Amino acid sequence: MSSTWGWLYVSMHQYGGLPSWLAALAVLLLAMALSVYFAMAGGAWVTLYRKWFLHARQHEGRYATHAKSFLLRSEVNLGLAGAVMFAALWTLAELARGQWFTGFPWGAAGYAHGNSLLAVYAPWVGVYGMGAIAALVAMGAPLMVSVMLSRRTRAGWVLLAAGVLLLFVLPALLVRFVPSFTAPAGTMSVRLLQGNIPQDEKFIPGTGVQTALTWYAEQLLANPEPLVVTPETAIPVLLQQLPAAYWQSLNDKYAGRTANQGAQNTESGNPQLALIGLPMGGANVGYSNSVLALGSGALKYRYDKQHLVPFGEFVPPFFQWFVRMMNIPLGDFGQQRTYASVLSWQGQRLLPQICYEDLFGEEVAQYFALENQAPTVLVNMSNLAWFGNTTAPAQHTAISQLRALEFQRPVIRATNTGLTALINHKGEVTKSLPTFTRGVLVGEFEGRTGLTPYAQWTSQWGLWPLCLLCGAIVLFLGAFFRRSRS
C-alpha cells in the first residue's frame, strides 16, 4: 500500500517543505489507515470461514457412510465457498476505500490486470469487478492446493477447472463471440500541449508564470488543428489577472476573427476549439479549478472540477494544523456540484476531466445515462508535476486506460510533465510524448458511440449493485457456515 502512495512523499517533502522523516511517516500512516479496510476483510474471512473449514475437517468422519458423489460435492463447495466469500469481502473493502472520506481508490486490484486476460471483463463489471475476479482466483488457488493435499484429488481438479474456465476459457469466448458494444463516430485531429513547467516555479511571477503564459499562448495561436487541449492550470493565474490583449487574441483566434478586421477568418477553413485549464473565480464568489472552451459562434462552455483533492484543493476538517506545516500554494477551491454537460463539437461529444477525476469511473458513468448524449471521447487535463519523477505518471495513465476499456471510449491526456498521450477505445496507448519534456503531440482519435454493460448499470445505479451483491454473498455464506457448524 505504501508503494501505491509513494509519490506523495515528493509533494510533501520536495514541494511542501516537510522534513523527510515526517513526509515518509505521513505516507506510512496513510497506507496503514487505508490498509484497515483489508485487515477487516481478512479478519472477517477468518472468523466466518476458517472455523467452518476446520469444523468440516474435524468431523469429516461423519461422511464415511455417504456416497463418493456427496464427498466430491462437499469438498468442491468447501473450496468454492471460501474463495467466493473472500472475493466478496475484498470487494466490499475496495468499495469502501474508494468511496468513504472523499475516496482513495488508487491501487485498486483491477488496475493490475488492465493488460491481462482479465481486461476482457472491464466493459462488463469495471475495475472493481475485475478486482473481485482476481481475488476469487487468488484465494481459490491455495484452497485448491489444500483440497489436493488432503487427498481429495478429484475435488481439486474440479476447482482447477473452474479457475481455468474463469481465467482463460470465458475471456476467449467473450473475445471471439461478443462483438464490440460501441461503434465508430468519426475521427478528429487533436493537438495536445505539454509545457513541462517545473512545479516549484509554476506559480512564481516572473519565472514559471511568465514562461507558461508565453509558451502556451504561442502554441494556442499557432494551432492548425480542429482541437487543442492544454494541461490543468496551464494558465496559472486568474482570468481577470491576464492582460486584456492576451485573452482577446486567443478569443479572436478561436472565434474565427482576425484581430484587425473582427470578421470571419477563413485562413484555416475549419472551426477550431481550444480547451484551456486555468483557475476561475474570485474572493467574493470562491475559486474553482476549471476548463474554459474557446470556439467559434455562440460557444460558451466552462467545466469546474467536481471531485477535489484533499489537502491539495481543499482542507479536510481538523487538518488545518497539518496544512500549516507545509508551504505548498494550496488552492482554496470550491467543490462545485452542478452538472456540467458534455461539450458537442464537430460531430464529437467531449467530456473534460481534471486531474484524478477519471479515477472515479462511477462518476464518469453519470454522463452515460442517455446514450444519445453520452461522450464519444474522454479528455483528461492534469498536472502531475507535484509528484516528480515517480510512478505517478504511469499509474495515472493506467487509470485512463482502464476507463477506456470500461466505456470503450478513447481517452486523450494533456499533462504538464507527462504522460501526454492518445489512448484508443481498447485501452492501448497509440501515441505519447516523453515525460518531463516540453512538446506538442499531434494525432488523431476515433470517437465512439454506444454503451457497454458497465456504462449502462453504473449510469443508473452507481456501484450499488456490486455492493449489494457482495453484501448478500457475505450474509448468505455466513449464515450457511453457522448452520453447518451447528
Where are these regions (language model features)?
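Membrane-embedded alpha-helical bundles of multi-pass enzymes
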Residues: M1-F177, M381, N389-T390, T430, ...
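Soluble catalytic domains of enzymes that build or remodel membrane lipids, polysaccharides, and related
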Residues: R176-W461
